[in-house]
Amino acid sequence: MPTIQQLIRLGRSVKVSKTASPALEKCPQKRGVCTRVYTTTPKKPNSALRKVARVRLSNKVEVTAYIPGEGHNLQEHSIVLIRGGRVKDLPGVRYHIVRGSLDTSGVADRKQSRSKYGAKQPKAGAPAAPVKGKGKK
């Protein structure tokens, strides 16, 4: 507990909060150009080939961003939109690429959670394909 004299001399120090996505510079999203698109493996105990891209943002910062969903059309020089959001089992990946915006296509044949993957609503006349995991066994 500080004395009154110590408070007069030094004052209270304000806690500085650290942002989880510093490259966005307080913006909700940022545009960037893919410099490298590749796959990487997650930390233990998980096992997969996660799709990621190295992106050079409009503010000249280079970050690693995750490509969500099944299949993608990204390659070098593709223009993408990134948002914050880390991938827990990929160290150093603190951003997500927004599907369905700029050069990134939406996920094909996506029926549920479509807005998160940039998928358009299926046509009303088209026959509904059976959804995996749903139905009788």
UniProtKB/Swiss-Prot annotation:
GO cellular component, one term: small ribosomal subunit
BP GO terms, sorted: translation
Entries under InterPro entries matching the protein: NA-bd_OB-fold, Ribosomal_uS12, Ribosomal_uS12_bac
GO molecular function, one term: rRNA binding
Keyword line: Methylation, Ribonucleoprotein, Ribosomal protein, RNA-binding, rRNA-binding, tRNA-binding
Similarity comment: family membership: Belongs to the universal ribosomal protein uS12 family.
Subunit structure: Part of the 30S ribosomal subunit. Contacts proteins S8 and S17. May interact with IF1 in the 30S initiation complex.
Extent of Low complexity compositional bias: 116-137
This protein's record includes keyword Transport: no
Residue numbers of 3-methylthioaspartic acid PTMs: 89
Location of region: Disordered: 101-137
Name of this chain's protein: Small ribosomal subunit protein uS12
Functional description taken from the UniProt entry: With S4 and S5 plays an important role in translational accuracy. Interacts with and stabilizes bases of the 16S rRNA that are involved in tRNA selection in the A site and with the mRNA backbone. Located at the interface of the 30S and 50S subunits, it traverses the body of the 30S subunit contacting proteins on the other side and probably holding the rRNA structure together. The combined cluster of proteins S8, S12 and S17 appears to hold together the shoulder and platform of the 30S subunit.
